Regions:
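N-terminal cap/lid segment of alpha/beta-hydrolase-fold proteins
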Residues: 1-9
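Conserved HGGG/HGGXW glycine-rich cap/lid loop of the alpha/beta-hydrolase fold
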Residues: 8-60
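Active-site loop/oxyanion-hole signature of alpha/beta-hydrolase fold enzymes
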Residues: 37, 48-91, 259
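Gly/Ala-rich beta-loop-alpha elbow adjacent to hydrolase catalytic centers
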Residues: 92-96, 100
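Flexible "cap/lid" loop of the alpha/beta hydrolase fold
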Residues: 105, 112-143
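Conserved serine/cysteine hydrolase catalytic core
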Residues: 179-228
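Catalytic histidine neighborhood in serine/cysteine hydrolases
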Residues: 228-248
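Catalytic histidine-centered segment of alpha/beta-hydrolase-like enzymes
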Residues: 245-254, 258
Length: 266
């Protein structure tokens, strides 16, 4: 289904029956609702997945209009109200994790639990944020110049280097998703949702009163540290570190990720 908002049009995939609190999945950069298909097909809980603007079938209505993290939070909130959903178990991976934290900070009463995979609270130092934003602007230009070349190079990112060994079929599906995007929309998404554009959310995270589940792959040293830093901030948080996985745990170690979901929601 599609829901058109003032600044974006969101594509939403949902279970036919939402008779209990659903798990809402948010994918990472270059992903889509298809990134969660395998996980969603193997859980008993009702679920929802959304294409983040600029990805898959979700679009920015005007590529030249300003759009911020808060705009996505507001549009997601309105979408949930239209679907008559009052509570969610929110699960976000990487970029989707940052959007999940941002949404939870603005609409905490909507959150039953928060599962964040390989993500962070943003960048604290203003100068470091500016440096990162400039880097992402350069990447967005490369997307607009040649999406095929960008997706090929993106697959060689050290965060993803063992994915094909661990889940060949899932990795091939992921490559297909990456190639399917509209290059102007994807480039705009990176400009919009760059971590350099994101507010630093440490203070908000400290105030969360719902269960927080932090998931990291054992090979992803940088994000294990991010997870441990978050763990120290909130007594409601717990961290899972998964063997034989790096950045994308739900793809590289699907059974372990499903075990976590089963422990939490069954």
């Amino acid at each position: 289904m599609y829901i058109k908002h003032s600044k974006s049009t969101l594509f939403i995939s949902k279970s036919k029956i939402l008779n209990e609190i659903p798990i809402l999945f948010l994918h990472g950069f270059t992903g889509s609702t298809k990134s969660w298909l395998s996980i969603r097909s193997k859980i008993s809980s009702p679920s929802i997945s959304i294409d983040i603007p600029g990805h898959g079938k979700s679009t920015f209505n005007n590529l030249n209009e300003s759009y911020f993290f808060k705009d996505f939070s507001n549009e997601l909130y309105i979408s949930l109200l239209q679907m008559k959903i009052k509570k969610i178990n929110l699960c976000g991976y990487s970029l989707g994790g940052r959007l999940a934290i941002t949404f939870a900070a603005k609409y905490p009463d909507m959150i039953n639990s928060l599962l964040i995979e390989s993500t962070s609270l943003g960048i604290e130092d203003r100068i470091d944020r500016e440096i990162r934003y400039k880097k992402d602007l350069n990447i967005s230009e490369s997307i607009e110049e040649n999406l095929t070349e960008f997706t090929k190079n993106w697959s060689f990112n050290k965060l993803f280097e063992k994915q094909e060994l661990r889940n060949k079929e899932g990795t091939l599906d992921q490559k297909t998703v990456r190639k399917s995007h509209n290059k102007e929309q994807l480039a705009r998404s990176l400009k919009t949702f760059s971590i350099g554009n994101m507010p630093f959310l440490r203070n908000q995270f400290q105030k969360f009163t719902f269960p927080i589940i932090i998931v990291n792959g054992k090979d992803d040293i940088e994000y294990i540290k991010e997870g441990r830093d978050m763990l120290k901030l909130n007594k409601n948080a717990m961290q899972y570190i998964i063997n034989n996985a790096s950045h994308n745990v739900h793809l590289e170690s699907e059974e372990s990720f499903l075990d976590i979901l089963s422990d939490l929601y069954n």
